[in-house]
């Protein structure tokens, strides 16, 4: 059995670790609330752009944007959204497992894949498996800025427009609630027709027409690009909210485990100390009897 000094050292070490995990839990909880707010604020913009684009597309059916053109899929672009940091449970593992499964499916059909990494963990993973990475952005910080993302996103959008890829997929972690996050792999391009289809309610709400400057085609082109960029930004915002939630839960679990370990070590310490005292008393009694 370990001595009391060794056990005290272990207790001190675990206590220090628990202080760190507890602090990280509190920081993650604070960042999670801010990340959720950013995520909620991003949704109305994307939805408003979609509504206007849908209205313009229905008013100008003769115009077909390249983002809506279906082609035989021989080459695919994959945008992989992960975190820059670890200590967030199985968040990155789950989404990268979904990406791996999708890559195996595509490669099994003879489809070439080129990837864009958003987040350091995704970049490390893609480099490790030897994937073709055409663009990346890392170190986004706690607040994602669209201007940091546009350069990496544009590489895939231009590749689709120029016919270099026939589809673009987006993988990220969708935020469900604090305790649940879901890995997603969705088709970003070509845009599904139902995404730009107006409901009856939207048709009534957008029953007017616009005066276009310079012309309807240019406006629709710009709007659809902004819409796709907004979808990627929304995915990054959801991923960040998921990251902070997962980190808070992981650090709470670590703090709870540390508390249990401290309790067990304290019990061992008490037993060891009691055994040492009992031994000393026995030696004193034996010595007194001998005299």
From Swiss-Prot:
The keyword Transport applies. PROSITE patterns: ATPASE_GAMMA. GO terms for molecular function: ATP binding; proton-transporting ATP synthase activity, rotational mechanism. It is a peripheral membrane protein. Its main location: membrane. GO terms for cellular component: plasma membrane; proton-transporting ATP synthase complex. Keywords: ATP synthesis, Cell inner membrane, Cell membrane, CF(1), Hydrogen ion transport, Ion transport, Membrane, Transport. It is found in: Cell inner membrane. One of its GO terms (biological process) is proton motive force-driven plasma membrane ATP synthesis. InterPro entries: ATP_synth_F1_ATPase_gsu (IPR035968), ATP_synth_F1_gsu (IPR000131), ATP_synth_F1_gsu_CS (IPR023632). Pfam families: ATP-synt. F-type ATPases have 2 components, CF(1) - the catalytic core - and CF(0) - the membrane proton channel. CF(1) has five subunits: alpha(3), beta(3), gamma(1), delta(1), epsilon(1). CF(0) has three main subunits: a, b and c. Belongs to the ATPase gamma chain family. Produces ATP from ADP in the presence of a proton gradient across the membrane. The gamma chain is believed to be important in regulating ATPase activity and the flow of protons through the CF(0) complex. This is ATP synthase gamma chain.
């Amino acid at each position: 059995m370990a001595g009391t000094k060794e056990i005290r050292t272990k207790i001190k070490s675990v206590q220090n670790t628990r202080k760190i995990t507890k602090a990280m839990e509190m920081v993650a909880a604070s960042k999670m609330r801010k990340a959720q707010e950013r995520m909620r604020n991003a949704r109305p913009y994307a939805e408003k752009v979609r509504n206007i684009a849908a209205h313009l597309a229905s008013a100008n059916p003769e115009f077909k944007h390249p983002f809506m053109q279906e082609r035989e899929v021989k080459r695919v672009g994959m945008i992989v959204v992960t975190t820059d940091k670890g200590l967030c449970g199985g968040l990155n593992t789950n989404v990268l497992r979904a990406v791996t499964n999708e890559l195996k499916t595509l490669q099994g059909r003879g489809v070439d894949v080129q990837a864009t990494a958003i987040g350091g963990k995704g970049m490390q993973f893609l480099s490790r498996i030897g994937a073709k990475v055409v663009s990346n952005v890392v170190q986004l910080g706690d607040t994602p800025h669209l201007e940091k993302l546009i350069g990496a996103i544009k590489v895939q959008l231009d590749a689709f427009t120029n016919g270099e890829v026939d589809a673009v997929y987006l993988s990220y972690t969708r935020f469900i609630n604090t305790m649940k996050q879901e890995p997603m792999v969705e088709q970003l391009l070509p845009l599904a027709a139902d995404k730009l289809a107006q409901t009856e309610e939207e048709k009534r709400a957008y029953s007017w027409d616009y005066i276009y400057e310079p012309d309807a085609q240019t406006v629709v082109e710009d709007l659809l690009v902004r819409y796709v960029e907004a979808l990627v930004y929304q995915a990054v915002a959801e991923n960040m909210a998921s990251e902070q939630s997962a980190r808070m839960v992981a650090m709470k679990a670590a703090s709870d485990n540390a508390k249990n370990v401290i309790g067990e070590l304290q019990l061992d310490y008490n037993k060891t100390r009691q055994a040492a005292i009992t031994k000393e008393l026995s030696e004193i009694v034996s010595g007194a009897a001998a005299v």
